Regions:
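Membrane-anchoring alpha-helices and their flanking helix-loop junctions
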Residues: 1-120, 137-197
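Histidine-centered phosphotransfer motif of kinases
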Residues: 120-121, 125-133
């Protein structure tokens, strides 16, 4: 099995671990920078049981496939496409967080507060939910980077379904808070998630 863990496997796994570590640490640091360390909990790391299970399954797929079909992981063009997706997704998400500033939270606000503003400039001018768009691209990109066909499809379907349920729920409150301003914004701006209006 050690002959299967050549340069490509080491590179792909290192990129995956660095992508995951950077994603979570940068989210945590941004939450502290924007909201102050008194408003930060371990939930700010965005690691849930379902997320940990998904990542574990993706690594399991990787190791099974590299053992049974080592050539399957040698598609550099596919792997590098995934790496580009990870970088693009990460960039879109972080631009969303920085642009929204104190209006950005990881939890859906159900009650308005003075710091919550309707953000329609920057990346929000083009994408209504850029943090979700970025996460979808990032998460699917991690699996393409590993040349994991099963996890690529599973991550795409599961993350898409999560946002299909979350976006209408979140937008219910945004319409309550911002009224016709949000209606007009939603009408002219794409959600950023395929097939979700």
């Amino acid at each position: 099995m050690t002959e299967n863990f050549g340069f490509t496997a080491c590179r792909q796994l290192l990129q995956m671990f660095l992508a995951v570590i950077f994603f979570h640490c940068s989210e945590f640091v941004l939450v502290i920078a924007i909201h102050g360390k008194n408003n930060v909990t371990l939930r700010s790391l965005l690691i849930s049981k379902n997320y940990a299970l998904a990542m574990t399954c993706s690594l399991l797929e990787y190791f099974v496939e590299i053992y049974l079909f080592p050539g399957m992981k040698e598609h550099w063009v596919i792997s590098n496409t995934g790496l580009v997706m990870v970088i693009v997704g990460e960039t879109i998400r972080k631009l969303a967080i920085i642009t929204a500033g104190r209006s950005f939270t990881h939890l859906i606000r159900r009650y308005p507060n003075d710091q919550h503003k309707l953000v329609t400039h920057g990346i929000y001018k083009y994408i209504r939910h850029p943090s979700y768009c970025g996460f979808l691209i990032w998460s699917v990109g991690t699996q393409i980077m590993l040349c994991n066909p099963v996890s690529t499809l599973a991550f795409a379907a599961i993350v898409w379904r999560f946002f299909k349920e979350r976006i209408p729920y979140e937008e219910f409150f945004l319409r309550q808070f911002f009224g016709s301003g949000y209606e007009e914004y939603a009408r002219r701006t794409n959600s950023g998630i395929p097939f979700i209006k």
